[in-house]
């Protein structure tokens, strides 16, 4: 993880530059003015990863300048990370400095926290983990009030839970999420909550069904399910699928069907190219899809999946790469127009931005 340059005094100007860049990318499609959702200036990042660097006979948190993995910058605190992470950093460092068992061949530390205060720490080692390590790790987890995961080659030891529990409020309703260690979650919780509320409002109240591609742990699935008759959601990651199923059950939602298929495979299924055993018991023809929600990886949608979305009246698209978003919109522009668009500043002090668009059929 490279070291970001935090300068709150420059935040407004940097956000304006991002908004201008998004406007430039969407200008060929006659997009309306983007709604801009800012980030907290500090303590916004709910997860952080540090390498350990030996200096002066001790291990220290370290990060690196972009493009230089050999020049370590020692870290004592991390202002972009959540207050909970900043509380835990010195406590954990004191623990490994006091214990040869905890520090021996420890090379990486990961923190995962939530807006609701939950925390999980992952310790990664270049050695096998034994009973002595587990005993000290159990005491450490109790002392810090966290769950803890130890990782070494081919082995994982979980103390407490291997996930954190988050609560996000959308349109006045609180949704509970399990966010697993090692799986993708939105790093900026405050902005994530703004994204969920925007998507919920943009979709509107529908009397038909929603298809969701790339659903992850159900981050958007849960609130959007309250806006439609039924949801068919797809995800390829086994860890994310299991978390999504637990989240659906924890929130008492009974109108969501989740299948472990890639977007490309679902496209084949809907086009009746070939059957899939993982769709056994699901009658695709019983769905009346009026909308599709997509939150693809940085590469955007592949051309076939993009063509699939064309058949829907409404396309709600969250993008972590507006460059590929614009490419996908160009493919759809002859049949769909942009009704709403938004910029979500998930990653302050970087050039990265998250965008949302609602496309409706012309």
From Swiss-Prot:
- Supply the InterPro entries for this chain: MeTrfase_TrmA_AS (IPR030390), MeTrfase_TrmA_CS (IPR030391), SAM-dependent_MTases_sf (IPR029063), TrmA_MeTrfase (IPR011869), U5_MeTrfase_fam (IPR010280)
Q: Which reaction does it catalyse?
A: uridine(54) in tRNA + S-adenosyl-L-methionine = 5-methyluridine(54) in tRNA + S-adenosyl-L-homocysteine + H(+); uridine(341) in tmRNA + S-adenosyl-L-methionine = 5-methyluridine(341) in tmRNA + S-adenosyl-L-homocysteine + H(+)
- Molecular-function GO terms, alphabetical: rRNA binding; tRNA (uracil(54)-C5)-methyltransferase activity, S-adenosyl methionine-dependent; tRNA binding
SUPFAM superfamilies associated with the record: S-adenosyl-L-methionine-dependent methyltransferases (SSF53335)
Q: Which GO terms describe its cellular component?
A: cytosol
Biological process terms in GO annotation: tRNA methylation
Q: Which UniProt keywords apply?
A: Methyltransferase, S-adenosyl-L-methionine, Transferase, tRNA processing
Query: If you read the UniProt record, what top EC class would you report for this enzyme, in one word?
Result: transferase
Catalytic residues as annotated in Swiss-Prot or TrEMBL: 320 (nucleophile), 354 (proton acceptor)
In the Enzyme Commission scheme, what number(s) does this protein have? 2.1.1.-, 2.1.1.35
List positions binding S-adenosyl-L-methionine.
Answer: 186, 214, 219, 235, 295
The record's comment on protein family reads:
Belongs to the class I-like SAM-binding methyltransferase superfamily. RNA M5U methyltransferase family. TrmA subfamily.
Explain the purpose of this protein.
Dual-specificity methyltransferase that catalyzes the formation of 5-methyluridine at position 54 (m5U54) in all tRNAs, and that of position 341 (m5U341) in tmRNA (transfer-mRNA).
Write down what this protein is called. Answer: tRNA/tmRNA (uracil-C(5))-methyltransferase
Organism the protein comes from: Stutzerimonas stutzeri (strain A1501) (Pseudomonas stutzeri)
């Amino acid at each position: 993880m490279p070291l970001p340059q935090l300068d709150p005094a420059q935040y407004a100007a940097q956000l304006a530059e991002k908004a201008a860049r998004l406007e430039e990318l969407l200008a060929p499609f006659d997009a309306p003015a983007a709604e801009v959702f800012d980030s907290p200036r500090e303590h916004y990042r709910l997860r952080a990863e540090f390498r350990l660097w030996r200096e002066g006979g001790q291990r220290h948190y370290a990060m690196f300048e972009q493009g230089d993995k050999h020049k370590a910058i020692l870290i004592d605190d991390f202002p972009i990370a959540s207050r909970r992470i900043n509380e835990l950093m010195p406590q954990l460092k004191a623990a490994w400095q006091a214990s040869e068992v905890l520090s021996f061949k420890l090379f990486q530390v990961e923190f995962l926290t939530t807006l609701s205060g939950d925390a999980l720490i992952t310790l990664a080692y270049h050695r096998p983990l034994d009973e002595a390590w587990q005993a000290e790790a159990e005491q450490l987890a109790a002392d810090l009030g966290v769950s803890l995961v130890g990782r070494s080659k081919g082995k994982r030891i979980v103390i407490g839970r291997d996930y954190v529990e988050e609560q996000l409020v959308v349109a006045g309703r609180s949704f509970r999420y399990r966010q697993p260690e090692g799986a993708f979650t939105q790093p900026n919780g405050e902005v994530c909550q703004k994204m969920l509320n925007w998507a919920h409002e943009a979709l509107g109240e529908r009397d038909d069904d929603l298809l969701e591609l790339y659903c992850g742990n159900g981050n958007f699935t849960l609130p959007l399910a309250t806006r439609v008759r039924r949801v068919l959601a797809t995800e390829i990651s086994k860890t994310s699928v299991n978390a999504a199923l637990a989240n659906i059950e924890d929130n008492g939602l009974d109108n969501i069907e989740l299948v472990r298929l890639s977007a490309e495979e679902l496209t084949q299924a809907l086009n009746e190219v070939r059957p899939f055993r993982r769709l056994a018991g699901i009658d695709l023809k019983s769905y009346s899809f009026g909308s599709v929600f997509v939150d693809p990886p940085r590469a955007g949608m592949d051309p076939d999946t993009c063509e699939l979305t064309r058949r829907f009246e409404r396309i709600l698209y969250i993008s972590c790469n507006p460059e590929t978003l614009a490419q996908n919109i160009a493919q759809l522009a002859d049949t769909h127009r942009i009704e709403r668009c938004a910029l979500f500043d998930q990653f302050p002090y970087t050039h990265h931005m998250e965008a949302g668009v609602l496309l409706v059929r012309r």
